[in-house]
């Protein structure tokens, strides 16, 4: 028992130390840097200022933030529309087949997402496989311009983040009470009524979790916007990258990062509140 207790203490200390060293302290450094002044020689001057946050109210940066929210929302809705039927199909398959499809769904996580985006870029380019195939079929006369458009960014985000939507949806659908669905049909409910009034409310936790897992990273995947959208389709993640790596304005980059973190924190708060309300509703029913 003593050895087990010592081992648990070592594990706890290791985890806490890791969080403090690699999460808490870097966050404090970013917060502190966001209130300092830019210096051309040393990047940061130890002079307190709020200008970095007031600059974010500039129409240019505010528009980029709204554009990022819009793109993330569209990508989330697209993932939900595509992911729900697939998760339903996956949950209704025989138990012997499910592990294989789940494995195929998880396999992309083993490959760097940047490499996958490069592959998607080649596939969708003017002389890529998609256009060549459509030209061969005679569906189009000239190649379709997909790359470097907002649509290309959406496609890239959906391509990367779709599994994050499918997994929580699959988990919720798999837990559906079959006798409850059969009872609804016995009482005369149509398939549409059963889906809207029973299935959607019961799978709402998975829907909310999936939307959160897609929307939060969608705002910061700057390399998707760089490779698929070009300079005219920037996300807030691109602004942060440019400020840190190109312009070397670390204080403003830090302020932008903190603002994005606050926005994500508000989304998490909404998710937490929605989850509590859903749990209370289920308990009352």
Q: What is the meaning of each model-derived region?
A:
Residues 59-92:
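Transmembrane alpha-helix signature in integral membrane proteins
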Residues 13-24, 103, 107, 159, ...:
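Transmembrane alpha-helices
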Residues 2-8, 53-60, 218, 226-273:
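Interhelical loop and adjacent transmembrane-helix boundary motif
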Residues 1-30, 99, 103, 261:
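N-terminal signal-anchor/first transmembrane alpha helix
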Residues 2-6, 10-14, 36, 170-185, ...:
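C-terminal transmembrane helix and the adjacent membrane-cytosol boundary/short C-terminal tail
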Residues 41, 50, 117-158, 192, ...:
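Membrane-interfacial helix termini and adjacent extracytoplasmic/periplasmic loops
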């Amino acid at each position: 028992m003593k050895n087990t207790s010592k081992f648990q203490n070592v594990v706890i200390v290791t985890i806490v130390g890791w969080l403090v060293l690699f999460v808490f302290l870097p966050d404090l450094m970013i917060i502190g840097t966001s209130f300092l002044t830019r210096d051309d020689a040393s990047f940061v001057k130890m002079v307190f200022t709020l200008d970095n946050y007031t600059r974010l109210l500039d129409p240019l940066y505010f528009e980029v933030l709204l554009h990022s929210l819009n793109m993330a929302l569209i990508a989330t809705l697209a993932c939900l529309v595509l992911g729900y039927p697939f998760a339903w199909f996956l949950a209704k398959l025989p138990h012997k087949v499910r592990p294989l499809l789940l494995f195929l769904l998880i396999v992309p996580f083993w490959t760097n997402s940047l490499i996958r985006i490069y592959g998607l870029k080649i596939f969708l380019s003017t002389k890529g496989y998609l256009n060549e195939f459509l030209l061969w079929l005679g569906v189009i006369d000239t190649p379709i311009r997909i790359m470097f458009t907002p649509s290309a960014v959406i496609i890239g985000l959906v391509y990367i983040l779709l599994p994050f939507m499918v997994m929580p949806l699959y988990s919720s659908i798999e837990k559906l009470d079959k006798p409850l669905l059969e009872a609804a049909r016995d009482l005369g409910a149509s398939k549409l009524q059963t889906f809207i009034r029973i299935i959607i409310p019961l799978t709402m936790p998975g829907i909310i979790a999936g939307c959160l897992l897609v929307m939060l990273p969608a705002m910061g995947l700057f390399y998707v916007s760089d490779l698929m959208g070009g300079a005219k389709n920037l996300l807030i993640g691109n602004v942060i990258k440019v400020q840190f790596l190109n312009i070397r304005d670390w204080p403003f980059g830090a302020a932008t990062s903190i603002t994005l973190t606050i926005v994500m924190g508000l989304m998490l708060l909404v998710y937490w509140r929605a989850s509590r309300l859903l749990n209370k509703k289920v308990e009352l029913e």
